[in-house]
């Protein structure tokens, strides 16, 4: 691509494809920077850091001055960013085009600076309206908002804030809001034309999540209909931007080069079976043989990351005692991590130490960690693949794309020359797909279809999909919603469907909550749903601890032993929330209890946050959460209450059921496929269940049911009677 900032739009006689390719206005930074500016650590001010009314005016003035002084210092760093150096040209295109596509390579500063340029323009022209910046991940939304608030010289939640699922720091004063794509969709459900916003920025569009693709479709409808005044900026970290331009009628494409230093690539000579072990060994070798510099390790998921952190914590001191090498300090980084824990990753460490961050693909482009000189790439990621034939989501560990591999490697060359250690063979790298498959091509579209119905879209097949999921996927989504009671026989959204669309949950769990509100066990079901909403709440014990930990869990969960994992989660929640929360030393007591049962301490804190928010939502929707005393909310061993709770879950997960066979195996009700109870389940050794229900399906060497509960066949018949008749109908025929 030419590095000429004066290039112009292609002439009209070129073909459409050529026009798009040449309609790229590149801004390059030819000045070599000896050392990139350090990223100032993100403050942990995301927990409602507001100026108290009780503080004196003097304190407020001092706070204001310190914020502005900080912003002034950061401005010097901002001015060195490639994006900042082309501020005038970029803003010229944004102002004169309804849609602008901007390719900003990693390190260009697009995510922090472009929204601030637009905000300054709104101030200068005294225009009303706010700016929304979407992110595919909550951790990115939180960290970017925190950083930009610092650069803007304000407290988080004043002019700059964030809104993510179950956490919101915005106020009436907020003009620049970072939010997850899911939260913007939720705002669309409440305010169909998004009048609050003058500009909407879709960041990390190259990740092609289902929700991002859905937002692009909604935005195209808006600018072609009620909001021609709306300005849209689509930002991508990769060069594959032609599709975005074509979708928005050949919108101009701008290119800003990022800061890059050379990164040397290293590959394995032979494949490895144990990826966590290989990553640990690679980190130790780097620590023993390379100069100081932090290490960023990419692992497929939270489970592998927690395992790696645990192992590294155990061996780090021993390794540094054996040889004069830096002390390794390991940190996890994944989307489910609380904001306080996330902030530790970005803080510099003092002394003769080396930070090692174990991360999911969240660190590919969404966040920047200063000080990284080495990248260790497992070459793997976790994806959910929807199996239309089974009606189940399968969680798979799959190879990344070449584009992702390049993004990961680039993280080692942000501030200086670096090294990338790919834990796979070079011959395997060339076999990787060029780009990652769009999420919508492998996902269940039930939730997007519900949102479209809530929005008033009837012709789903011909809607302005950015990537049409196909007729089969759409019809199955419609059928699923019909069976859940969200749609009527004509495909119109029902009152139940309206309620489901407003809850920040998948439709199946929303259906469960609605049923619980009708039968009088909403508080208990909210507690269980909150536990299910947090990934990896129950950690996998080490092999030597497994039997002991399982015995402890079994001894505490008498009802769980009989009824399964959902009831077990409620029993554990009751102990954590009601019994351990009363003493003066509750925090320490809870931490010790979690460690003894191999339960995520961070996870349970997240559960409480999710629970609080769900109770707020449910009070608004149902007005039926009673303020009963604490003891009545606990589940105990009340068989009647437990049956009522499990029947509620059965209404949402009727397809996720299996019947016990004479040989003590299980076969799914919907397809007759064999399925096994996962070894981590409370019911793994229980061979006497007449039937089971599960909320998750995973496939390794065979199909496993997770979050398993015992059900009686009479319950199944009771709930299925109406659903079976509905399942035979083709929802598409009624449209």
Swiss-Prot record:
Origin: domain of life: Eukaryota
EC number(s) from the headed UniProt entry: 3.6.4.13
Biased composition (Polar residues): 1-13
Location within or outside the cell: Nucleus, Nucleolus
GO CC terms: nucleolus; nucleoplasm; small-subunit processome
Reactions that this protein is recorded to catalyse: ATP + H2O = ADP + phosphate + H(+)
Annotated stretches, region: Disordered: 1-29
UniProt entry tagged with the keyword Nucleus: yes
Domain spans labelled Helicase ATP-binding: 91-257
GO biological processes: maturation of SSU-rRNA; maturation of SSU-rRNA from tricistronic rRNA transcript (SSU-rRNA, 5.8S rRNA, LSU-rRNA); positive regulation of transcription by RNA polymerase I; ribosome biogenesis
Keywords linked to the UniProt accession: ATP-binding, Helicase, Hydrolase, Nucleotide-binding, Nucleus, RNA-binding, rRNA processing
Residues the record lists as binding ATP: 104-111
Span of domain Helicase C-terminal: 262-456
GO molecular function per UniProt: ATP binding; ATP hydrolysis activity; double-stranded RNA binding; helicase activity; identical protein binding; RNA helicase activity
Cross-referenced PANTHER family: ATP-DEPENDENT RNA HELICASE (PTHR18934), ATP-DEPENDENT RNA HELICASE DHX33 (PTHR18934:SF118)
Similarity comment: family membership: Belongs to the DEAD box helicase family. DEAH subfamily.
Name of the protein: Probable ATP-dependent RNA helicase DHR2
Species, as recorded: Saccharomyces cerevisiae (strain ATCC 204508 / S288c)
Gene that encodes it: DHR2
